[in-house]
């Protein structure tokens, strides 16, 4: 394990998006003494399988899992995340948007989401802003699930490709897995959004089936 390496992991089926994503990564300020690596997984069978494949190939302590249409615009993103991890070894994963308490439905959108994000849709860009200061005085909010557009870890926990073999609920599942392993999942305090997510059109064809799996595994049978 390389304690001074940060690996960005991107599952992609669109190299133009991936190149733009990597453009922003390469313009981040890298903390002194650290190095970065970028792994792309093309045409993965599922998000979980792609992430597991890349995770096993990397020796970096810190890993940033992100969509190919996520663009990191906060130049000090890496320093901010590493600072949180080093001061709080019990924190296993950081997101930019999350829910304090997962609804019984298993759908994050059914609860208040905290954090900041520029969401770029087909015809407009929206600012999602629900400051964590409204419910905590800490510089981060402990949450039960984070949105998968960006997920930053300091420990490796396998993604549940045995259960989620498509493109939905991998993020909520991984959040629950970190909590099951005794780690905290958090959303940090932000003055401005750290990322832009070019959402485009959202496909929900497999969503309900994956939701039912999630509810059965994590909501009906909590550990």
Task: Name these PLM-found stretches.
Residues 4-10, 37-39:
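Hydrophobic targeting segments
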Residues 14-30:
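Short, well-formed alpha-helical segments that are part of the catalytic scaffolds
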Residues 44-58:
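Glycine-rich, basic loop-to-helix element that forms the pyrophosphate-binding segment
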Residues 63:
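Short aromatic/hydrophobic "clamp" motif used to bind/position activated sugar donors
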Residues 67-71:
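The conserved acidic donor/metal-binding loop of glycosyltransferases
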Residues 76-117:
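Conserved donor NDP-sugar-binding/catalytic core segment of glycosyltransferases
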Residues 128-153:
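A recurrent flexible, glycine/aromatic-enriched loop bordering the glycosyltransferase active site
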Residues 145, 159-223:
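C-terminal catalytic/acceptor-binding lobe
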């Amino acid at each position: 394990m390389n304690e001074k390496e940060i690996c960005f992991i991107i599952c992609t089926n669109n190299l133009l998006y991936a190149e733009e994503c990597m453009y922003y990564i390469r313009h981040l300020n890298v903390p002194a003494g650290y190095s970065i690596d970028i792994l792309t997984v093309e045409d993965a069978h599922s998000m979980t399988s792609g992430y597991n494949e890349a995770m096993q190939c990397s020796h970096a302590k810190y890993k940033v899992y992100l969509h190919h249409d996520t663009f990191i615009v906060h130049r000090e993103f890496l320093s901010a995340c590493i600072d949180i991890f080093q001061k709080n070894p019990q924190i296993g994963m950081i997101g930019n948007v999350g829910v304090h308490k997962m609804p019984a439905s298993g759908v994050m959108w059914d609860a208040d989401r905290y954090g900041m994000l520029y969401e770029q849709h087909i015809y407009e860009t929206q600012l999602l802003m629900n400051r964590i200061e409204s419910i905590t005085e800490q510089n981060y909010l402990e949450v039960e699930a984070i949105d998968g557009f960006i997920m930053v870890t300091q420990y490796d926990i396998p993604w549940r490709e045995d259960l989620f073999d498509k493109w939905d609920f991998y993020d909520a599942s991984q959040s629950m897995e970190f909590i099951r392993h005794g780690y905290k999942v958090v959303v940090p305090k932000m003055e401005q959004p750290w990322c832009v997510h070019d959402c485009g059109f959202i496909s929900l064809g497999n969503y309900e089936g994956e939701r039912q799996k999630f509810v059965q595994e994590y909501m009906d049978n909590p550990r």
